[in-house]
Amino acid sequence: MRSSLRFASIVGAFALSTVAITPAMAAAPVSQAGANAVYLAVAGNGQGTGTVTATNDGSGEKKNNVGTAPTVVGALGNNPVLKAGVAAQDATAGVADGAGNSAACAGLAGEDGSVVKIGSGNCLKPGKALTLSLANLDLSNTTLIQPGTALDPLTSQLPALPVGQTLGTVTAAIEDAIAGTPLGEIGLSGNFGALQARCTASPGTAQGTANLANTSGDDQHTPITLSLPGGTSVILAKIPVNPAPNTKVVTGLDTVTQDIVNALKTQFNDALDGVAAPLDTVVDAIQDQLVTNLVAQLQPALQPLEQQVLDITLNKQTHPTPDSIKVNALDLQLLPAAQAAVGSSLVNLQIGNVACGPSGRVASSAAVAAPEAPAALPTSVSAGYAAMPGQHAGQGDDSSNAIVLGAFALLMAGAAGFISFRRLHR
Amino acid sequence: MNESVWDARIATWMSSLLVLCGVLAVAGLVLPSPAVEAAPTPGYQAMAAPAKPVRLVVPALKIRAPILPIEVTPQAVLDPPRNPRDVGWWQRSARPGATKGQTVLTGHTVHTGGGVMDRLGKLRKGQLVRVVTPKGTMTYSTTRVVTWSKAELARRAVSIFAQTRPTNRLVLITCSGWTGKDYTSNVVVFAKPLGVREKTAAA
């Protein structure tokens, strides 16, 4: 008898433990979100503000990397692309009525911009103009030019030439030249008050938006300017403050293609003239071939320019699953054609990057355990007032009546006195 | 613990169960069954279908007040309508005319006067309470008037508010026990349904 009870107790305890542990072991996030203010990669070498992530499996929100990157300067150091500004990135993951929900917001504002609490609205208030500029981008450390790609024709011929030993010098010179080419001097600028993306997700759905507040005084559009060597500048596009999902900034790019090609030739020749002078006439041929080949390599890449040189997408949205979303307020890729050479765009800049979802529901056992039952049945009836609404306690009907009667008595006494006074003075 | 002790205990339990069965059997013979209690009262007929209450009439207390649906708060508090002259019907409770459950109405008591249920505690057994609905006026007969402390009411919450009763009854609740600062108790009136007055009887 006793041994049977012990056995039953052990089995019961095991069963209870299993029931208690199983949900914890099976607990998967029912809501999740992530936010990153800025990501900048030059030739595939990325740096950014880190990513704030939030997850919730029904037992509470868990967040990572909270408080990273208060400013752009702090996050990106001496980057040449973005100057001082305020970065915001926050994500939240919650559960309401057993359903997971998440939200995220991230972006940049100019100096004096401020970060506001994440919610359904924006997370940044605009400050001074936030200038996006690639004008001084230093390409000297990139590997855009590699012997195996643009210089292939040259490397295959140089060993047969007497100047083979100068290969290293020339290659270095070309790299230096590239560093000073129009590619390095292309300027892209736009003055933003704030540039941010946000998203929300709940079971079965996920939405995202991007907002590009401007400082130009025009409430509807923000101009994006491309500047070329010599001070030429072209307004590429006037982008809407609230761009539609996956808006491409392409307007006018094809008009500057030839300008860039011409500038490239000039820059290459000027740069090589000095370095290659000691090599006399042999170098001229190499130089011509080099420039021709280099431009030939680049030129197809510049046609069409918007696809190969500068690719900007605003409010870039992707849905990894139907109930999740990723939003980039601005996704900029400079020279995507460099993909073949360096494995990535020369420059990839992403501002305001958020992801929300997918979302699920807390296991039904937890939902059943929600404290709904106690509220279903009243346990108290609060049906008493001290006095009628608008009337103070202690000034009930009795006291009110007394005041009225007193006032009436005073009025009557006054009237009687007045009548008596009149009679006495007749 | 040896087996003789167990045998003694089991015998005690069995005896108790037998006594309990006997008590229940006697009670079943003596007390009226729910079916008997729910039988139509002469002069009254069952309501065609349950309907939402719209007006409370208590002739003995000169109460004539509109009824508005109310809901329990997340804190499990049942608050009457804000206007102390209105009566609240807990909309999760039974509709007048239902054969089961409890129809719960509550109204304010105002210490300085003017509350719709200021004098609810004065109601006496047998006095009538009428609840007007779009489908007829249900008449109830007062069966019990009690005053319970707030804590006692909370303890009795299931018996007062639960909708599992096999027969319907009306429950009227207001506050009492004014201390000069707040109310410490509730007056609760229970009434059994008589039905809708037959037209011939009404005429």
PLM segments and residue spans:
Chain B
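N-terminal membrane-targeting segments
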Residues: 1-43
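Solvent-exposed, non-transmembrane regions of membrane-associated and secreted proteins
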Residues: 27-203
